[in-house]
C-alpha cells in the first residue's frame, strides 16, 4: 500500500476465468488497507464497439456477468464505465477529492488496467499499479508483458 486510495478495475463475474480466479479473494482482503476504495464496473452497452467490431456480447447491462466478483466494502464507491478507459466523470471526481496518487488493481492488466493507468497519468493523478493484485484474462504471460510496458510508460517505480 502506497496511498490511502485504491481503485479496483473490472473484477466482475463475467471476467473470472482460470487466470483470474484468485483475484477476487485477494482484492477483497486488500481493500481493508485503504481509507478510500473505488471500483470501476464495465457494462457492455447495446451499441458498443465491443459488439459491433469484436462481436463480443458479454457483460450486458443488468446481467449477472456485470456483478462484482467479490464483496466490496459498504463505503466504497462504484463507477460504471462503458469502454476500456476511465470516464471523465471519474477523473473529475478524483481531482475534486484532491487525489494526486492512487493504487490500482484489477483486470485485465493488458487492457483496462493499462488504459486506466494511462488515463490517470495523463490527468496528473499518479497510478501505482499493484502487480500482484492484477491479472489478465488471457494469461500470465500477457499480464507480465503488460507490466513491462507499463514500467516503461508510467515509470518503473509506479509498478509495485
Name the predicted role of every residue range:
Residues 19-21, 51-52, 116-118:
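Short amphipathic alpha-helical segments
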Residues 1-5, 14, 25, 29-33, ...:
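Active-site-adjacent betaalpha module
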Residues 9, 40, 131:
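Active-site flanking residues adjacent to catalytic metal/cofactor-binding acidic residues
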Residues 46-59:
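A short secondary-structure junction motif
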Residues 18, 47-50, 139-140:
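Short Asp/Glu-rich motifs
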Residues 2, 19-46:
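A short alpha/beta connector and helix-capping loop motif
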Residues 11-18:
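Short acidic, Gly/Ser-rich segments with clustered Asp/Glu that frequently serve as metal-coordination loops
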Amino acid at each position: 500500500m502506497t496511498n490511502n486510495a485504491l481503485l479496483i478495475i473490472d473484477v466482475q463475474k463475467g471476467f473470472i476465468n482460470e487466470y483470474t480466479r484468485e483475484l477476487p479473494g485477494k482484492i477483497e482482503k486488500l481493500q481493508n488497507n485503504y481509507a478510500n476504495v473505488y471500483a470501476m464496473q464495465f457494462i457492455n452497452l447495446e451499441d458498443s464497439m465491443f459488439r459491433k467490431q469484436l462481436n463480443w456480447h458479454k457483460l450486458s447491462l443488468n446481467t449477472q456477468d456485470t456483478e462484482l466478483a467479490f464483496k466490496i466494502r459498504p463505503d466504497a464507491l462504484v463507477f460504471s464505465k462503458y469502454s476500456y478507459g476511465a470516464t471523465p466523470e471519474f477523473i473529475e471526481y478524483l481531482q475534486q477529492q484532491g487525489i494526486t496518487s492512487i493504487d490500482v488493481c484489477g483486470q485485465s492488466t493488458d487492457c483496462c488496467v493499462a488504459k486506466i493507468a494511462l488515463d490517470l497519468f495523463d490527468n496528473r493523478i499518479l497510478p501505482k499499479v499493484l502487480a500482484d493484485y492484477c491479472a489478465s484474462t488471457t494469461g500470465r504471460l500477457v499480464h507480465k508483458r503488460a507490466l513491462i510496458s507499463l514500467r516503461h510508460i508510467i515509470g518503473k517505480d509506479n509498478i509495485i
